[in-house]
């Protein structure tokens, strides 16, 4: 296993495979099927460790864990002009900024 494993994992049920599937957000092409959630998590963690070790040995860039990334709180979203207008009107009618309205809608 990785010494300082800080990657983001998820275990979910696969109806198609009739098993649990372990996934890693930072390595979207990897997965591990197992009969129990615990085994799926252990399996995907081992696969990630093996792949990261191989990448390091080949001097490839290993993905940075999401948990270590800095988030500024800002991102740009492109929307159609008519939606921009509707949201601006809704914000004005509510007496809030467009940013505050968009943030409230995104957090729902």
Regions found by a protein language model. Name each.
Residues 1-8, 45-108:
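Short, charged, surface-exposed hinge/linker loops at domain edges
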Residues 27-28, 83:
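Short, charged/polar surface micro-motifs in flexible loops or helix N-caps
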Residues 28-39:
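A short, exposed loop/beta-hairpin motif centered on an aromatic-Gly-Thr core
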